[in-house]
Regions:
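Sec-dependent signal peptide recognition
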Residues: 2-7
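C-terminal motif of bacterial Sec signal peptides marking the signal peptidase cleavage site
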Residues: 13-16
Length: 161
């Protein structure tokens, strides 16, 4: 009988610990999703809130001819040139999904999402809709520390010329 009681108590303790961890990860994900919404809105408004990125943030994307990784100062320069010529519109509300730690497979507060973005060349009026996948990892302060995106960005933008 004592073994059964001890087993029940140990099981209850283990499940309560997991529940607290899950709750913390869920709260982190919710906060990080709010950060993502603010970043995407500021991007569409051509006024990116760069304070939401860590000073050490690393960007990794699929730009033809770009280095494997980009730093925040490089992204700022890319944005400046891009916003001078193009306008963007997000085609639907975002559906943020919880990301996972690639080593453990456990939810970790990171945010991933798929979306369509319409890009219009403001000089000639040509537009293209680009399907994009992005994921963002965050540090303990809730700032983006690792950003990756996948899309056919180079060909899509070239089609607007």
């Amino acid at each position: 009988m004592k073994k059964i009681i001890y087993s029940i108590l140990i099981s209850a303790y283990i499940f309560s610990c997991n529940s607290e961890t899950d709750s913390a990860v869920n709260q982190s994900f919710e906060e990080n999703s709010k950060t993502m919404q603010a970043l995407l809105t500021s991007y569409a408004n051509e006024d990116v809130d760069y304070s939401r990125f860590s000073d050490d943030v690393v960007f990794r994307g699929t730009l033809l001819g770009a280095p494997d990784t980009l730093r925040l100062d490089q992204i700022k320069a890319i944005h400046k040139d891009f916003f001078a010529k193009y306008d963007v519109k997000h085609m639907a509300p975002f559906n943020f999904l919880q990301g996972v730690n690639p080593e453990t497979g456990e939810s970790d507060g990171s945010v991933r999402f798929y979306y369509d973005m319409q890009v219009t060349n403001s000089e000639n009026g040509k537009s293209v809709v680009i399907p994009i996948y992005e994921s963002f990892d965050f540090d303990d302060e809730g700032k983006a520390i690792y950003v990756q995106w996948y899309c056919d960005w180079t060909a899509s933008i070239s089609s607007l010329e």
